[in-house]
């Protein structure tokens, strides 16, 4: 599909190294999971299918994925497990401070393009005692963790990114064949952003702030539902997502 063909534009290195592997948490009926499957088969990558949220930690240790495709609930579970393991004593205090240090680091990166010396120092102080352990829980090889299917809490995103866990967020719908906006490598980090238009797509914001999409992978119509199909497109052919958003210059 078009989405699968466009993915190498964002993950060229990952998709051309056969030693890399992908762990999927999304259902196989999900359009993004399908697209990832297609490109992995084409790139001869190993694909692991997670058993479920209850076996998350064990699945991560078996797969040791380079790429993870997850819903926000998976990252929430990893965070909660780390917090509970730290407990309420001295380790708990250290973990809480590490969370704040990671978040503040990424907030400075988002606001200024880079973090200041103090934020860098605080972040580095927690790396060997907190962040490194977190990365090992995720299998120790993660280069790309894509969260989709629901909004990811910006504070949670800032924590993982600040801890050296490469979490990326995108935006899309089944009608757009999964992602139509994404955070590719090299695009500056902005907290709360879902990135830029995916190759082959155009995005615009209507007067009522609705996100509208046009592109080669946008569906043409609903099956045997002409009324819904007509209501879903503007007169000039843009798909009405029904979601609100804004585009930053």
Which positions does each model-derived feature cover?
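Active-site loops of AMP-binding adenylate-forming
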Residues: 152, 161-166, 173-192, 225-228
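Conserved AMP-binding/adenylation subdomain of ANL enzymes
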Residues: 2-22, 28-131, 141
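Conserved ATP-binding/catalytic segment of the ANL
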Residues: 197-200, 204-249
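Alpha-helix/helix-capping structural signal
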Residues: 73, 150-151, 217
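Active-site glycine-centered loops adjacent to acidic/histidine catalytic or metal-binding residues
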Residues: 27, 149, 172, 195, ...
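Ser/Thr-glycine-rich phosphate-binding loops at phosphate-binding pockets of nucleotides
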Residues: 1, 172-176, 241
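Adenylate-forming
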Residues: 3-10, 36, 77-82, 146, ...
């Amino acid at each position: 599909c078009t989405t699968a063909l466009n993915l190498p534009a964002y993950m060229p290195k990952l998709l051309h190294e056969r030693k890399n592997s992908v762990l999927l948490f999304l259902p196989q009926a999900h359009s993004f999971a399908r697209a990832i499957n297609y490109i992995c088969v084409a790139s001869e990558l190993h694909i692991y299918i997670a058993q479920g949220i209850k076996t998350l930690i064990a699945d991560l240790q078996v797969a040791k994925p380079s790429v993870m495709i997850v819903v926000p609930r998976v990252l929430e579970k990893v965070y909660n497990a780390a917090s509970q393991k730290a407990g309420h004593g001295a380790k708990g205090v250290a973990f809480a401070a590490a969370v704040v240090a990671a978040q503040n680091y990424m907030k400075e990166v988002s606001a200024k393009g880079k973090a200041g010396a103090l934020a860098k120092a605080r972040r580095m102080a927690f790396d060997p005692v907190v962040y490194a352990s977190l990365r090992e829980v995720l299998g120790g090889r993660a280069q790309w963790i894509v969260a989709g299917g629901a909004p990811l809490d910006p504070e949670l995103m800032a924590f993982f990114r600040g801890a050296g866990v490469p979490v990326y967020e995108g935006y899309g719908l089944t009608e757009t064949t999964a992602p139509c906006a994404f955070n590719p490598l090299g695009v500056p980090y902005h907290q709360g952003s879902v990135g830029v238009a995916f190759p082959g797509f155009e995005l615009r914001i209507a007067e009522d702030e609705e996100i509208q999409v046009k592109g080669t992978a946008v569906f043409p119509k609903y099956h045997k539902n002409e009324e819904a199909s007509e209501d879903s497109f503007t007169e000039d052919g843009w798909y009405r997502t029904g979601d609100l958003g804004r585009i930053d210059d």
